[in-house]
Amino acid sequence: MSIQNEMPGYNDVYQLLNQQGVGLTPAEMHGLISGLLCGGNTDSSWQPLVHDLTNEGLAFGHELAQALRNMHSAISDSLDDDGFLFQLYLPEGDAVSVFDRADALAGWVNHFLLGLGVSQPKLDKVKDETGEAIDDLRNIAQLGYDEDEDQEELEMSLEEIIEYVRVAALLCHDTFARQQPTAPEVRKPTLH
C-alpha cells in the first residue's frame, strides 16, 4: 500500500469529526465506508452518500474530507489485496478499555450494515453463506456485555468476534463487489 493510501490516525479522525459536529466515531465512519465498498459502491457516489447519511447532506470541510478520502482509498486498497490487509478500525492502546472496544465494534458493525444496505437494497433476500454472515452481523450489532465479567475473558472473546466480523465483511465484498468472471462472448457466425 502506498503512503498516500495509509489509514489516517484514529484520534486525528476523531478530532476532525468532532470539529465538524459529525455525530459518528471513527470506527462508525470506517464501518460505513467499508459497508459501501463491500456492497459494491466503487465510484465517487460514496461521498454524497456519506454526506447524506452523516451530515444532513452537507459536504465536509477540507481536512475531514481529505482524511475520509484517504480512509476510503486505504479501505479499497486493503479489500482489493484479497482482503489480507483489511482490518476493522477500532480504538487501541492502554487507555482504551475492553468495554470501549466492544462499544466501538458494535458501532462499526451497525454502520457497516447501513453502508451495505444502501449499496445492496435487497440485503434481506441474500441467502447462503453471505446471508448467514449478514444475520450474524445483525446479532453482533446488538452486542452487550456485563461490566462485572472477567476482562481478560471478554478481551479474548472480543478478539474472536472482531476476526469473525472481518471475515464476514470480506465475504460480503466477495459476494457484492468482486467482478464475477463472465462467460466468453459467443459470436454468431457471419454470413458473407
From Swiss-Prot:
Regions crossing the membrane: none
Protein known as: UPF0149 protein KPN78578_32810
Family assignment from sequence similarity: Belongs to the UPF0149 family.
Gene Ontology annotations for the cellular component aspect, listed alphabetically: cytosol
Signal peptide boundaries: none
InterPro entries recorded: YgfB-like, YgfB-like_sf
Entry superkingdom: Bacteria
NCBIfam families reported for this sequence: PRK01736.1, ygfB_yecA
Disulfide bonds: none
SUPFAM superfamilies: YgfB-like
